[in-house]
């Protein structure tokens, strides 16, 4: 952990401990945390689109893990608000398991368009939900090609929790790494965000309240981080 300007920055290991405290000790379900994370992502997407998503095109890049599940929740909410949503399944639907797979079933039942990688994206906003804080090393295929395509598209990118390809603990960008205009990070920021090399990948950083218990914030000496709102701009 590092402490900067009244805010705790956690390593990937410490963030995992915070999640385990919420899930294993206090009984908050993975599904609840995923719902909250995706909802906050969708709320920030709406803000970035001028406060109105109806008729606007949003493409969500979805990986196999819980980060992808967060993206699927965000896709559902933007769709419900009238957005024109496309979900790109980076590794196919069969790669998703457990909570993300359940989210995908709901998305498909709602009639949200799901596609395989490839082709040209036409969107006002891309949502990067490919890799989460547990990822290490440079992304491999097929994710690497998706990341390069996203960066090359010139469509503004909102990263879910952290830009895919960025090491949460060290802040070392992989090859490739998403170049986001905005990042919605969940709970507390990661130590890697303090690395100057990481900051061009992160863009504007927002902290999103996903209902991690108060004990998490008290443990890291910043209990009031969301006292004035559930989406807080850090820089």
Regions found by a protein language model. Give the residues of each.
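Generic structural signal for well-ordered, non-membrane alpha-helical segments
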Residues: 8-15, 27-38, 71, 96-103, ...
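Positively charged, low-complexity intrinsically disordered leader regions
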Residues: 1-56, 214-235
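Generic, low-specificity signal for short hydrophobic/alpha-helical stretches with a mild N-terminal bias
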Residues: 4, 15-19, 23, 27, ...
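Nucleotide and nucleotide-moiety/phosphate-recognizing core
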Residues: 43-130, 138-160
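YjeF_N-associated NAD(P)HX repair module
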Residues: 2-10, 125-235
